[in-house]
A protein has these predicted regions:
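Short, acidic, Ser/Thr-enriched surface-loop or helix-capping motifs
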Residues: 43, 56-57, 159-160
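A short beta-strand-turn-helix
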Residues: 46-70
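N-terminal targeting signals for export/organelle localization
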Residues: 1-51, 190
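Thiol/disulfide oxidoreductase modules built on the thioredoxin-like
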Residues: 66, 129-131, 137-187
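Hydrophobic beta-strand anchors of alpha/beta hydrolase catalytic cores
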Residues: 71-72, 104, 156
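Structural microenvironment flanking redox-active thiols in thiol-disulfide oxidoreductases
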Residues: 83-128, 136-146
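Short active-site neighborhood of thiol/selenol oxidoreductases, capturing the structured segment around
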Residues: 61-83, 89
Length: 190
């Protein structure tokens, strides 16, 4: 399984430290998902998700292609809920509670140099964000967030191994609940 975590960004091309870029170009292949709402039935469930190609803070390539179940986590550095969620995700990983076979990818989005907790790269490093979880930097135009219908932060999108949306959640989620929802969603899609 794979999980993708995203962090928000608002401007392009800004460098914070030598070799670290907080914004990146994101290519989207496929149709964008509808914006998420609190409706009882999410119209994106079962829909083929777009594939994102972008880069991490140091220019490494990050792609959200099908192949393994993947959790995308969209994070904004200035979001209080995200600031509470990241340490929970770190503990979830270090305690070995992440479902076996799940890939996790973070996406930093809605990045704003004028907002608190900037830059996202330093924030995630301070929190000891798992190094094996790729982090994609969104564009200043929030290309990745828009493609996945992000409506709040943190925002979770679970993709099955075929790349179809199995679950979307907005807001802080306890990791026990997250694990349960992931397992239930993947059981429904198999």
């Amino acid at each position: 399984m794979a999980a993708i975590i995203a962090v928000a960004s608002q401007s392009g091309g800004d460098f914070v430290a030598a070799g670290v870029e907080e914004f990146g170009k994101v290519e989207v292949v496929g149709d964008s998902l509808p914006e998420f709402s609190d409706a009882a039935i999410d119209p994106a469930i079962g829909v083929m998700a777009p594939v994102l190609t972008g880069q991490g803070f140091t220019g490494n390539s990050v792609v959200t292609s099908p192949g393994a179940p993947t959790l995308l986590v969209f994070l904004a550095h200035w979001c209080g809920f995200c600031q509470r969620e990241v340490p929970l995700l770190v503990k979830w990983n270090s305690a070995g509670e992440v479902p076996v076979g799940l890939d996790v990818v973070a996406i930093t989005t809605s990045t704003d140099p004028a907002s608190p907790n900037f830059p996202p790269s330093e924030w995630l490093a301070r929190e000891k964000f798992p190094p094996l979880w790729p982090v994609m930097t969104d564009s200043g135009e929030k290309t990745a967030a828009t493609a996945f219908g992000v409506s709040g932060f943190p925002f979770f999108v679970l993709l099955d191994a075929e790349g179809k949306v199995a679950l979307r959640l907005s807001g802080g989620v306890e990791t026990g609940v997250l694990t349960e929802q992931i397992n239930q969603a993947l059981t429904r899609t198999n």
